[in-house]
Amino acid sequence: MTMTDPIADMLSRVRNASNAFHESVSMPSSKIKANIAEILKEEGYIADYTVNDAKVGKTLDIELKYGPSRERSISGLRRVSKPGLRVYAKSNELPQVLGGLGVAIISTSHGLLTDREAQNKGVGGEVLAYVW
C-alpha cells in the first residue's frame, strides 16, 4: 500500500521518537526527507542523519538531540501543506514560527529552504512544515 503523505509520516515518527526519548529513529528514505533532515541538522534540532542502503530501497536514520538534563530540542513539529490542501506563500508573506524562534520549511524553486533563507533570496513556495 502506498503512503499518502510521506512527509507527515516522517514528522510523526520524529515527534513520537522525541516524545519517547529515543536516541534515533529510522524510516524509508527519499530526497525530500533527506533535505528536511539536513535543514533540521543545520538548525540544531537533530544531532545527525545518515542514508543507508537496504535490501529494498534506502533508509533514513536520524539521531535525535537532547539537552544536558534530557530536555527535547524539538518542542513541536507541524505539517502545514497537505495533499488535500496545499499552502503557498509569496516571498513577502512567508510565515514566522513563534516570532522567529522556530523554523518554517519551504519548498522553493531553489530547493528546500528555511523561511529566513527564502526571505533573503526573495523566493516564495510551498510551506511544508513548522518546527519549533
UniProtKB/Swiss-Prot annotation:
Keywords, ordered alphabetically: Ribonucleoprotein, Ribosomal protein, RNA-binding, rRNA-binding
Note the InterPro entries from the entry: Ribosomal_uS8 (IPR000630), Ribosomal_uS8_sf (IPR035987)
Q: Which GO terms describe its biological process?
A: translation
- Give GO cellular component annotations, separated by semicolons: ribonucleoprotein complex; ribosome
Highest taxon of the lineage:
Bacteria
Which GO molecular function terms does the record list? rRNA binding; structural constituent of ribosome
Does the keyword section mention Ribonucleoprotein? yes
Per the similarity annotation, which family is this? Belongs to the universal ribosomal protein uS8 family.
Q: What does this protein do?
A: One of the primary rRNA binding proteins, it binds directly to 16S rRNA central domain where it helps coordinate assembly of the platform of the 30S subunit.
HAMAP family xref list? Ribosomal_uS8_B
Task: Please give the subunit comment from the record.
Answer: Part of the 30S ribosomal subunit. Contacts proteins S5 and S12.
PANTHER family found in the cross-reference section:
40S RIBOSOMAL PROTEIN S15A (PTHR11758)
Q: What is this protein called?
A: Small ribosomal subunit protein uS8
Q: Specify the species.
A: Corynebacterium jeikeium (strain K411)
Per the record, the gene is: rpsH
